[in-house]
Amino acid sequence: MNSTQATTGMTTGSATSADGTTIGYLQVGTGPAVVLLHGGNESARSHAQLALALADAFTVYLPDRRGRGRSGPHQADHGLRTEVEDLTAVTAAAEAELVFGVSTGALIALCAARAGSGIRRVAAYEPALLMDAGRYTGWLGRFDQELAAGKTAAALITSLHGLDLAPPAFKLMPRPLAEALTNAAMKSEDRKAGPEDVTMRRLAPTVRYDGLLLAETAGTIARFADVTADVLLLGGDMQRPGFIRPAFDALSQTLPRSRRAEFAGLDHGGSSDPGPTNRSGQPAVVAPAIRSFFAQQ
């Protein structure tokens, strides 16, 4: 089952963020409300299979972060505050106290819980938090230039290398070849895409905002000592971006009400639907831990 098939039969809705921007979402299931917040280079559809795995026990909401699907565009002043306001708008509309987030989505969920948004439990899959700015934000200038020049494949390769997310084969091959392969993959995806499919090409402009979010929150680990929500830190034991493990370990010691669970054989995309750009996704493996955590009173 692919993400498009998994979303068949889901209903749609929307919430209005503090600045008036529409935040669209998919909805499925019956029971207490749970919001699943996707990470960078993803959309609401990226966790459709995880939503279905939880839908017999929860009403699951899958919001599109800005610039994707049914949600409105980024504004000039977009930043962490905006992301928290967008998530808060959805949790308020859904009357949700339970949030799962992955990567930057996990970071946003933790920040929203810290801001007093009424979130009671957060399941955070490999939160994308930098212990310091370091080398993981230096790619943004080149990325913006390449995207502005219409070199989408080049921009995506720049972000993959800058965030230590490039597949091993891409790290070894000449950059022009990696760009050519990425461009061919995008063209193939474009030909097959339906009107609601969120393709790599459509997602590319959103990547910069995740990079800016990383830069804005770099070095803020101490702030998370203020989070009063119960937190389940989730992750895989495979190769991750280099900054994930230090943050994962630091958060487990900083968050006052946290526990951790790690999954053998999973990587940074472990909770997301499997597909051409995420061949290692195994949401069915992650779902039981989330279900158990959210079922606790």
Regions found by a protein language model. Give the residues of each.
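Alpha/beta-hydrolase active-site loop signature
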Residues: 41, 65-69, 129, 265-270
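Conserved HGGG/HGGXW glycine-rich cap/lid loop of the alpha/beta-hydrolase fold
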Residues: 14-72, 76
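Catalytic active-site module of serine/aspartate enzymes centered on a nucleophile-bearing elbow/loop
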Residues: 257-297
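Active-site loop/oxyanion-hole signature of alpha/beta-hydrolase fold enzymes
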Residues: 61-100, 104, 276-285
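Short beta-strand/loop motif that positions the catalytic acidic residue
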Residues: 227, 233-235
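Hydrophobic, aromatic-rich cap/lid helix
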Residues: 182-219
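Conserved alpha/beta-hydrolase "acid-adjacent" motif
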Residues: 240-247
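Conserved hydrolase catalytic core segment
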Residues: 96-135
